Amino acid sequence: MDEDSATIQLGDRRLGNAVDHDLLPGPPGVDEKSGNENCEPRSSGSGKRGKSNSRRRSTSRGRSDSRNTSPSNTRRRHSLSRSLTPPRRRYDSPDYGRYSRRRFDRDRRRSPERRRSPPRRGRRYGRSRSRSMSPRRGGRWSPKKKPSSPPVPPPHGGPHPQMTPGYGAMAAHIYGSYVAPPDVYGHQYGIPPNSFPPQGPGYGIPGAPPDQSSFGSGYGPPPTSAWDVNVYGQQVWINQPISGVQPSASDSLIQPQKARETLSGKTIGEEQSVPALEGAGLTPQDAVAQEAEKQKDELKKQRANYVKKVSLLKKEMKVLKDQREDLAAGDAPPSPTTKNFIEENDRLQMQIKKKLDTIENVIDMLNGIIGYEEVEDEPSNQKSHGKTQPEQQDSRSHSSSESSADSSESSSSSSTASDSSSDNEDGEGAGGAVGSPTNRLKHRAIKSMKSKQLHGEMKAVPTQAQNYNFVFFDPEQHWCESCGVFPKSARDYLKHLHAEEHMNRETIETPWHVGIDHDPFPTFENAPARRVPVRGMQFLVPANAWFCKLCSVWIGDLHCASAHLKSRLHSNKYQQFLNQNPNYEIEWQTNRERAMNQQKDHDDAKNKKSKKDEDKASKKRKKKGGDKKKKKRKHGKKSKRSTIDANSTSSSSDSSSSEEENGQQPKKGRTEQQPICQSDKSTNAASIRVAMRKQESTPTNLKPEVPCQPVVPPPPPIIKDSTIPSERGKWTAASVEDQSKDQKNRDDTMLKQWNNVQPVISESEKKLLEQLKGRLKNKGARDQNNHKAVPTEANDEKFRRGGGRHSRSRSKRRSYSRSISRGRDRDRRDRERDRDRGRRRRSRSRGRHFSRSPIRSSRRSRSRQGRSRRSRSRSIERVERPVVKHSEFRPRTVPERKQTDIKRDKKDAESKSKSSKPSNNSLPGGKKLPFIGKMPVFKKQSVPSFNYDASAVYTNGCLEAPPPPPPPLGGATSQIAVRQQAPTAAQIQMAMMEDAFGNAPPFHPDAGMMVDYDELMPDPVQFANLMTSCPPPPPPGEGSEGDAHGPEDGDQHDNENREDVLPPGIDEAESALVPHPLDAAAQSRDGELPKDLVEALDIIFPSDVAILEASNGNSEKQEDVTITTIVEDDAVLSVIHLQDLAKEGIHLVTINEAEVPKKSHIQTSEKIEKLQDLNGKSDDGVNIKLIDAEDIPMPNSPPAEPSFDEETKSKALQKQADISEIPEPAVSPSDSEKLRRQSELDELAMLGIDRSDMAAQYAL
């Protein structure tokens, strides 16, 4: 056994000598490695067995060998190694050696060679490489671990057990005392990192091992005791009794060194096995742990820096992203500059992203080296880096030993070192090792591991809860409590805070004034004052800022506001506020909803109120406007009707009726008309108008009873359109009882009349109507200027609607005493008559139609307008109209008149006179009825009124009176009309033909003339009656004269004025009124209205007596006036038979008319136009002034009647003489008649009668 150990020692020595010779010239660092290699040649030669043997022997022999080694050699080599080790540390330091070697093992063994070898090392690595495979694993650790000198322990390892028993204590004492100093010295240097201990064995092996081997081989026991003997005399002999065991007493000073040496020897081959470390002491492990910790600290620092860089880069990335969102915000496309900014932003983001990727990779590598446990020590780094992995932490904590083994055998983690050290302590049982630094490190490592595990477990949950990327959004639930505004978005809310509405609120908040530190300069009591300018103003920048009350932070713009609201500071502050006030959000939300609901209700209420107010205001305006339009305007059809109705109601009632009643009465009239006429609504307006026109145009006046009859349900609808419904209402109010009595008879008569009327209308009449329309339209401009109304509209209304309206107004005026049905029938008949007469007049005086048609049309339109305008002052109009027409047309009306027209006129005059004693009020109603025949008359009326009888005009009160005459004429004219009812149909047709050609009067015989004037005369008769009735009773006398005069003057004046005014107006009105309605009305109305018919017949036929009786009986009424006038006319004509006289009168008129066109139609037309213009001007100017004076007293004064009677009689006689002289055109000189007519018109104008009213009366 001893020999074997000796041989081993000798071999070791040789290896050591050879190595020493080679290493001495080289650098010490290389020598150490060579020494390591010398320590390992055995292992290399013996292979892995040698390594195992060295491990076995290291425990016992290592210690004795380290002591037996010559102190001088070890000291010298330690000293040399000291100076030379730093470079080896530099290259073999843990930075390069340990981890590089580990990396080299991982990374194909390149890095360690590069790092280890300057060129010298590279040269000598030839042997070292060949010798040491093991050093490659732990070779870099060898310099630190060589203090245990692995070569020395193996040789002693074998013989050590042999030497202890063989050689006793002597050898041990000798070498033990000698060897002790190097051990102490080596231990001193071993305390710093293991540099010195490894060097000692490297250099001490060659000298000492031979001695040790020789002595060890001879003296086994001494080496064991040698550990106890020291050069310094430290308890050398105390350890001797423990020859086979390591003395514990000496371990207090020496054991640390031994442990380091043994561990260093094991760490040289630390790869060999952990049990080697377990058997070794803890001191070498302390050095390893310290170095590992240092390296880890450095790596931790590096990783912390990288983590900080990552956090900064991420912040920059967020800023860039926010900026890009702001740049890209908005619907409008970005501008070129904005695009450039966006591109630059994208480029920067890409760069930062690349940097982040690289840095994160480096951090991953460091985590793999250091372990993720270290990350837990830096939670801030974890959060910033975002790579907290609790699972990995747990796995690391549990598998710390595995990770350390994987990283490197030498660079095992502190936990592994602590575990191994604890095992070694347990195995060795060294009590003194508890207070060693290794123990302390071990305990620290264990505690840190346990604490880390606990912290990892504790932090696992909160870290998981924080693993979210917060994305903020706008809840769009904003509310400015002070202003009561609900902005839609956060941006709108921030803008609202700067709006005037918010800035001008009553309460203003200034939280920034609280706790603000202005940092003013201190003030000293006795110090002098020094003036200093305020500087730095140029650095102030304006900003629409906001102040966060929670955070006490100023925010300069929207970008900063967005950043602040999304910041952790603001979120934390708000969370703290919520923690203090947990119900704040709920309360705020409920208050917001409540305020929103209140605001909505308030807004709705305001809107409703405003709408209601607007509606009310609009309704009031409409009502007022409607009332005003009804009273003043006549543009709209409805407004015209309403105004006519209102006017008719006020006029039909006492003249003192108020305007309010006018506004309401039309409605009442309409409502009353509805029950009266049940089928009115059912019938269409068009059919009603057509039927009414046909009935009016038809000579079927045999049934004039219908107008007198109350409302007939089937016809009334037609009448309603043709005749004004307001009239019905008035009639109903005045004569509802009569309507109820005669309603059945009226229905039958109305139906019969309509049936007869429709076929009566001929195509020639229709043509004439169309011609009249065209002429009126063409010549309407003049009339518009004079009457301020469109002639075309007047014509259209006349034929379509106007006739009905005017007739309605007339019938209203008449309706007071009449039944509704009577007014309707009369209106219809008046329309037909007026149209036919206008046509005939125009046809007769085609040569003069230029003057007639325009004048008539203008007068008609004027009369219509004047009627509506003058409805209030109807008394004046009525007086004026009958006067004018009475004087002109009385002779013709007496000879022949349509029954229907006469009856209508009679009834109208009677009803109006009854309803309103003042003839002026009743006249307006009469205006509309006689207007049909009067239109042409009034056109001529300007001149003819003067020509015929100025006195008659005056007596009648006004030229306007002729239109109203229909009501007064109704009685008288009806009587006259009764006479000539039979011939009216044929005669009317003849008259239409004659009028169309204009030559009818001269060519036709008396009968023919009678026929012509039957249609033409009914209006004159009505006018004559009205003229007489409308003025006071005196007008009839003058009316007769006017009548006598009328035919002559009418013819002449018509000739002068182209006979449009006088002959057509006189002839048509009078003839239509006298012949037709008298017969039919008297016959048919005997049952219904016997009084009216009888009175009319008596007044007409008996001449003066009947007229006087009628005038006396009806002096209060207008009918008396009309009757007296007609009677006077009849009396004047009674010298000859009434019929003959009428016929002759008609002949005279027709002859005059015929002669005039033959002589000079153009001249007469021109003269008439001139006279009409003059008359119109004079009328317009004078009528207003003289209306009250002359019109009112004239109709109302009965004493004037006799004067008029005388005048009318004289005029009638003159007219009779003139009638005989009619064939001679010179009988009525145009000039004298014109002068007369002009004077009459002037007087009428003075009375306040407008030519327009006259024209309207005649037109309709």
Swiss-Prot record:
Q: What Gene Ontology terms describe what this protein does at the molecular function level? A: zinc ion binding
> What is its subcellular localisation?
Nucleus
Q: Which residues carry this modification: Phosphoserine?
A: 335, 697, 1197, 1228, 1232
Q: Which GO terms describe its cellular component?
A: nucleoplasm
| Coiled coil residues, start to end | 285-366
- Domain of life, per UniProt, equals Eukaryota
Region Disordered: list its residue ranges. 1-168, 376-441, 594-929, 1023-1063, 1189-1239
Q: Which UniProt keywords apply?
A: Coiled coil, Metal-binding, Nucleus, Phosphoprotein, Zinc, Zinc-finger
Q: Where is the composition biased (Basic and acidic residues)?
A: 11-23, 102-116, 594-617, 738-750, 763-773, 822-837, 874-913, 1042-1061
| Sequence ranges of Pro residues compositional bias | 148-158
Q: Where are the zinc fingers (Matrin-type)?
A: 546-576
Extent of Basic residues compositional bias: 48-60, 117-130, 137-147, 618-641, 801-816, 838-873
Composition-biased stretches, type Polar residues, lie in 381-392, 672-686, 752-761
Q: Which InterPro entries match?
A: Znf318-like (IPR055309)
Modification Phosphothreonine, positions: 338, 700
Q: Where is the composition biased (Low complexity)?
A: 400-421
Q: What is its main location?
A: nucleus
Example GO biological process: negative regulation of DNA-templated transcription
Q: Which PANTHER family match?
A: ZINC FINGER CONTAINING PROTEIN, ZINC FINGER PROTEIN 318
Protein name, per record: Zinc finger matrin-type protein CG9776
